[in-house]
Amino acid sequence: MRVRGGQEAAQDKETSLDSDEERGRRGLRQTTLLDYMAGPAKPKKPEPPPTLHREREPESKYQNTLPETTGKEPASMSLRRNQPSSKHEEYNSESGDVRGLTLEPSPQSELSDDDVILELVREPWVESVRGYLLDVRYDGSLGKAVLMLYDPSSGSLVKWADRTGHKPYFLTDARPEDLRAAGVDVSHDESFLQYDLVEKFHPIDRKLVKLTKIVVSDPLAVRRLREKVSSAGFSVWEADIKYHHNYIFDRQLIPGILYEVGGVRIVHTLPLEMDDATRIVDEIFREEPREVRERAREWLRIFEAPPPKLPLIAFDIEVYSPIATRLPDPSTAPYPVISAATADSSGRSRVVLLYRDGVEFTEGALPEGTEVEIYDSERAMLLDLVRILQRYPLVVSFNGDNFDLPYIARRLEVLGVPREFAPIELKQDYATFRRSLHIDLHKLFGIRALQVYAFGNKYRELSLESISRALLGKGKVELKAPVSELNLNKLIEYNLQDARLTLELLTFSNNLVFNLIIMVMRTSKLGIEDITRSQISNWIRGLMYWEHRRRRWLIPSRGEIEKLSSAGARVGAIIKDKKYRGAIVLDPPVGIFFRVLVLDFASLYPSLIKQWNLSYETVNNPNCRDTIEVPEVGHRVCREFKGISNEIVGMLRDFRVRLYKKKSKDKSLREEERLWYDVVQSAMKVYINASYGVFGSEKFSLYSLPVAESVTALGRAVLRGTLEKSRELNLHIVYGDTDSLFIWDPPKDVLNDLVDYVERTYGLELELDKVFRAILFSGLKKNYLGITEEGDIVIKGMVAKKSNTPEFIKDEFSKAVKILSKLEKPEDVEAILAELRDHINTVYNNVKKKVYTLDQFAIKVMLSKNPREYDKNTPQHVKAAMLLQRLGLTLSRGDIVYYVKTRDKLGVKPVQLARLSDVDPGKYVEHVKTAFEQMLMAFGISWDDISGVRKLDRLLFDS
């Protein structure tokens, strides 16, 4: 452990928070170690937040966020005055003991702030390299696309500027003379470069078309000129594609694989020999046309290429805040960063701390293997932090886009680092580095398709705690005090745990999530910073556009595709916010069933897309003569040519089912290979299962209502036919949902007959998904609780898993689930019900007697906007926030409000102002009822049938 000296000038004696802006305007200056040793003058005190007089001990930890009115100012946030010491005791990493440690500056030579900044802004340009393509950016100062590649030989990220002469453009059906005649001669625009005549195949019209390509020097000019051209009555195409995406599509780049770049050459290197690829593809796709097999061989080589192994670093910062429930505003960065932790893929952990008077180490060990440095200069600390981060090709954060990076960037500006020297780049909707790439796991794990198909809905809340608990089995360090009040031991432990969790979420199970990202990049043809921040519709769009360019197809306009919807939907929508009818969901029974098998149609919708040749250009296309009608909805599907969606989805499905699912379980392969193949098949699963849905989303650029409607209609026909056959075979179907059947204790031979029927009739595979030894149905759709033969609990819709559920409800529901997990056989039901009844009665008694603490009753909600912006229908958490504002506390968007439900007219109080006596038990009855009522329905008893509940309700509401 060592103390790092700052770079403040000797005459700059003011070191309080209030002087940051003023010191920042003076620019960058160096000082000597002797200046640092002299120490700062007594600092000014920051303005204390509004105070509240308290005459009682706090009943909630959140009440500590309101300061006492003692007349004393809060502890200052000054830089440390370091005095020379004759004794220097190093941190003992073996014992972990920090007692008696003397903190003093290191006499070793240090980089000045200026030197660090020069290192941070130095660009890693190369003329040639052999490396993995991770991303493509547009550099406005160069007017060129820039490839971001990981160079394994140096272990660093390098940049290569395009030398192929690629420029922004868009297409129109207007000839140059037509534009001049219409008074929109774009050749006079300052960004105009040239007109080109190009020929493209129109996938809907089924013919070659000649178009004018308007080439410009600036991507922003595309938007400006396309409006002029279209307003003159001409059609435009491919004018809304981001330039760096256009570059990838035109150059047919595949992010995530190895390239050799130099001169004007950009050539990928794939390990699998073409002869081997031909043999495997011919076996799987023997019935497909030659051109499809050729494309499949290229796909196979991409899938077989092993993923890169990059040095990774995760980081997290902690910021001082005078109000514990407030997240400091990153746009102004008013308070200092007091701690920052990093954890890298080599196992190295670092924590940098800002020295603060009165904040010391206590007894106890620091986290094992941790390097700790203490700075008297926040600016030097932050510059060193970013310098460390940018040494890695890939930086990982959790919510770094919205908080950590914007805060650091703005804070450096406050501390005097000019914006043009800032190492962090703040984009419109994300943040990154000049010399590194950045992944924000908060956005990655918020991608719905990954949450459902890759991680099986294991997490519901998009918090580091929730996701880590679900995927890693561990979580954040629990705190009993606000971060700003922690001693250094606890601050280090808390901060470092967040960084380590962030890294582990990317690297657990042999780099599972990172490898999944690489596979999605290769499939979507998008860079790493794009795919980790966008929903799957953008992934599919990237793949579709890339394939259009490969085939020299024109990407049709939205209006052209919508014309094919003129046949209209024949079945009304029954799903909220959808324009087409969805899948069949059977009405479930009420009760408990033992030994229920769940059978799934393997990749039902992707299989139907392949079988029926469904694609935006094949459904209702007037230029096709040979068609077949989709039952129930009446759309006509072309059989003269293969649709692009049919080919892509079908190919991914066949690769997954017929090759990679098997390879992922092949014990003859090395474990590393099996794990990679499991990632490959998982990525394919994500793609193919979302493929039909995007065509039914109006936000999707290739939106096609007839395609989405045809897929679900065919799915309903398959499920109805299978149900009829099940009845013929005397199988007891207790429930069905979209592509799943819940069958009660079926004979094995009869079940095999059903599987054979589905394969013969529909060409689909009916697979065993899971076996429940017991399952509880409440009678509501998509609402059940099952215990598998392995003892795993599967809960569907039975409890609200929202972050604003009172903590005691979550705990008590988990205890109830543990009781239900004891169900083994019908004879257990009576005893389990009795135990469950006792548990619920205990919960009610605890609510009535207020056994739970104020914090357990608290409901936590984040403000989505400033309280003053609510003019009507004010939510409860906003009412609580307004009470705090009346005391002088400033609350804004992003602040977390903790409140309880009370007996008074307003009905709520912030926890800071509440006492247990204020809590209204009757209002919490509804929370308990919501959590347990559906569970009880499965036992065939009503809410009031439980002994004591009716009486207890009356007592609660009347007391």
Swiss-Prot record:
GO terms for molecular function: DNA binding; DNA-directed DNA polymerase activity; nucleotide binding. It catalyses: DNA(n) + a 2'-deoxyribonucleoside 5'-triphosphate = DNA(n+1) + diphosphate. Its EC number is 2.7.7.7. Keywords: DNA replication, DNA-binding, DNA-directed DNA polymerase, Nucleotidyltransferase, Transferase. InterPro entries: DNA-dir_DNA_pol_B (IPR006172), DNA-dir_DNA_pol_B_CS (IPR017964), DNA-dir_DNA_pol_B_exonuc (IPR006133), DNA-dir_DNA_pol_B_multi_dom (IPR006134), DNA/RNA_pol_sf (IPR043502), DNA_pol_B_thumb (IPR042087), DNA_pol_palm_dom_sf (IPR023211), DNA_pol_type-B (IPR050240). It is an enzyme of class 2 (transferase). PROSITE patterns: DNA_POLYMERASE_B. Residues 1-110 are annotated as: Disordered. One of its GO terms (biological process) is DNA-templated DNA replication. Residues 44-60 have a biased composition (Basic and acidic residues). Belongs to the DNA polymerase type-B family. This is DNA polymerase 1.
